[in-house]
Each structure stands twice: as C-alpha cells, then as structure tokens.
C-alpha cells in the first residue's frame, strides 16, 4: 500500500524535535523508528529556530495542512523559541499566555504588518486546523531547558508548558 493509504503522523516544532546537520539531536527523528512503517507514515516537519509564530507565518503550517487528511495525526511541540522580543531581527516570539490578546507590529525584518498572538492562540490554530481536516492533534509540552536550580532541572509549568496544556484542553486535543 502507498503511504497515502496509511495514516500519517506529522511532527511539527523546533530544533528540540528535529535533528540538524550541526550535531543537535531532537526527539522527533528517533521517534520515527518506534513506528511500524507498514501501518503509519511519519513525517517530521519540525525545523530548528522556529517558534509557533514563525511556523505559521513562514507558511510551514499551510504546507502541512495541504496534505492532512482524516485519520492523520499532528504531534506539536513549541516553546523554546517563543520567548524574547516580538519585533527583533528574527520576529519569532509570541505573546506570553494563552488568551485572546494580540499586538500589531511592523516587522523589522521586512516592514510588513503582523498581528502577533499569544503562544496558546498559535497552538489553538494548529489544533483547530488539524481537526478541520479530520486529523487528531496531539500537544506535547516543551522539553525542559538546560536550566538548573538547587540541583534540579527548571520547569516551565507556569509558562509555555502550562499554556500548551490549557490550549489542548480548550480545544479537546490530546
């Protein structure tokens, strides 16, 4: 059977999800080996340096949406690149939170207007988009950063991980 007859698991996210030629190893590529290729086709569309915002604004989500079909899955993990200034030489940060807040900017990178959303709002766009195609969205909280306090790894359970959990719950995603 062709891969089109099988369900497809699309993985979207940043460098923590995708291996790079620079020696970085994300969890998405090794995950592929855990699935039976006779039953499901896995496509890792994650790319280093991307945030939930830039995955959308660069057209990467549209490229996934163009191929989604009923029975597919979208596994998403963002957050590592969603912090920082909204309008710098990368224009990749999202607004903090999970609410409906927006901020209109003229991007320094190209002078174009953009309405920046909250982190949770971008995730909800991915979730509702996947569901509109009959696919199952799966939200994964970001892997912990290499930040230690008192001998323990720091958690983002009051920021991006929390907002991911809230967005998934709001839209009944896994």
Where are these regions (language model features)?
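Serine-esterase "nucleophile elbow" of acetyl-processing enzymes
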Residues: 1-47, 62-74, 90-102, 168
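Short glycine-rich, polar/acidic loop-and-turn segments at beta strand-coil junctions
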Residues: 46-49, 80-82
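Structural motif
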Residues: 51-59
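Alpha-helical cap/lid subdomain in secreted, periplasmic
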Residues: 60-174
């Amino acid at each position: 059977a062709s891969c089109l007859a099988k369900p497809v698991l699309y993985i979207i996210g940043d460098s923590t999800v995708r291996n790079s030629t620079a020696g970085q190893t994300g969890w998405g590529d090794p995950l592929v080996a855990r699935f039976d290729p006779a039953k499901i086709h896995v496509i890792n569309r994650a790319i280093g340096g991307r945030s939930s915002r830039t995955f959308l604004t660069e057209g990467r989500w549209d490229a996934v949406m163009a191929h989604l079909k009923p029975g597919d899955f979208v596994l998403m993990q963002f957050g590592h690149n969603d912090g920082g200034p909204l309008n710098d030489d990368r224009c990749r940060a999202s607004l903090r939170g999970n609410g409906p807040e927006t901020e209109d900017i003229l991007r320094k990178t190209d002078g174009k207007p953009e309405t920046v959303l909250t982190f949770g709002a971008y995730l909800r766009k991915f979730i509702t988009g996947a569901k509109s195609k009959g696919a199952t969205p799966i939200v994964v909280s970001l892997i912990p950063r290499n930040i230690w306090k008192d001998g323990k790894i720091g958690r983002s359970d009051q920021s991006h991980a929390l907002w991911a959990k809230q967005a998934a719950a709001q839209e009944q995603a896994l």
